[in-house]
Amino acid sequence: FQFKAFPSNSHILADVLAQHDINANDVDGVDLVRLFDTINSRIELLLDANHMLGHAYFMKVRNSQDIADVIAYKVVPLLEEYFFDDPQKIQLIFNSLNVNGELKENAVYYHEELSPDNLFSYTGEYDIEPVKHFFVNPNLTSESLVQIYQG
């Protein structure tokens, strides 16, 4: 028995896509290599290298909608498991917040704040704190994806 590690590798991803005549540095205007490497660098910084995304997640990508689907239906659920107690880190990974910590337009990972002031006319002696509800932008665009690796 032998264990051989296959770390994340954007070059393998680019080579596989090239076999299908897809330029991984320009998939409908999205630099998939840069996006992949940026997400993994942020995961490594916020968690560790053992939790980085594998290149296999993106090997079947043919257009920017495929990238958006991988992000929404594969990457986000994985990150929600990784950061179940701190979903704002997912916003950091996707560069969804501006320099003031406010949600960017076209962000990948949104949040809404549920405020007791908006939901109850009276709370009595209860001290109810606002709660943030996090979710994937239902209208991911190429611009949303580019925003991950560009400020």
Regions found by a protein language model. Name each.
Residues 1-151:
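C-terminal regulatory/interaction module of P-loop NTP-utilizing enzymes
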